């Protein structure tokens, strides 16, 4: 009994340490990125190609930083059998056709999400997805998918559910509560994202959504000046 309690205690400590590190990572990178945002705004000049690249990089860096934090805490620090694989995406409305697209992403292979290939020929690819449903939710309620096995979860290509087992779709809102997109995290572990852990994921994801919201607003300002970003 003592041994069992000790094992449980160690497991609880490891879980709490992991949650703390995951939470801390978001605010650490947010503070670091603020100076980059300030620099971009100060140098704002519609049509500047370097600014265009900078705004896109801000989106991708937010996804990469979140992915790296999750991979470190739930991948590198655990055994191979306990390793959880993640994919992070920023979904938003395209500046070209106003349909939902994936503007930035991060995953183990560094490849664009497979569904984007179909998006080129079918702008309505993401209609009916969790992000699409969140766009129609005035309350901007985060969506937790404990298991993608349910028939209500839209599969974007054959076999997607065999790779994506659980997801969280978090609203990216601006200072006026306007929806600028969603921060989506998928993983290959059933039951990883649940409504019961909403507070943990709110604290974890919000710093990254703030970075994405500001980057999206900057992208819109560029578009108003006649400069289109590639999404």
Positions of predicted regions on the chain:
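Juxtadomain coupling helices with adjacent low-complexity linkers
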Residues: 179-231
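Residue-level recognition of the N-termini of beta-strands and the immediately preceding loop/turn
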Residues: 84-88, 113, 181
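Short solvent-exposed loop/turn micro-motifs enriched in small/polar/acidic residues
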Residues: 83, 163-165
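Intrinsically disordered, low-complexity terminal regulatory regions
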Residues: 4-104, 227-231
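Short, flexible loop/turn elements at secondary-structure junctions
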Residues: 92-94, 106, 174-176, 187-189
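Regulatory sensory and allosteric helical modules in signal-transduction proteins
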Residues: 92-162
């Amino acid at each position: 009994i003592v041994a069992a309690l000790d094992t449980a205690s160690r497991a609880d400590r490891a879980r709490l340490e992991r949650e703390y590190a995951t939470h801390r990572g978001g605010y650490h990178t947010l503070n670091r990125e603020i100076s980059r945002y300030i620099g971009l705004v100060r140098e704002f000049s519609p049509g500047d190609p370097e600014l265009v690249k900078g705004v896109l990089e801000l989106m991708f860096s937010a996804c990469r930083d979140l992915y790296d934090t999750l991979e470190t805490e739930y991948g590198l620090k655990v055994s191979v059998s306990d390793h959880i694989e993640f994919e992070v995406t920023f979904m938003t409305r395209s500046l070209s056709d106003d349909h939902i697209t994936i503007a930035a992403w991060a995953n183990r292979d560094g490849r664009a999400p497979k569904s984007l290939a179909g998006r080129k020929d079918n702008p309505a690819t993401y209609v009916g997805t969790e992000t699409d449903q969140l766009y129609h939710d005035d309350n901007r309620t985060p969506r937790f998918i404990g298991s993608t096995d349910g028939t209500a979860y839209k599969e974007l290509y054959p076999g997607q559910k065999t790779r994506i087992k659980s997801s969280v779709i978090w609203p990216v809102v601006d200072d006026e509560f306007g929806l600028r997109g969603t921060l989506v995290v998928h993983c290959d572990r059933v039951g990883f994202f649940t409504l019961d852990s909403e507070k943990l994921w709110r604290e974890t994801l919000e710093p990254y959504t703030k970075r994405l919201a500001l980057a999206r607003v900057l992208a819109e300002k560029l578009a108003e000046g006649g400069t289109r970003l590639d999404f």
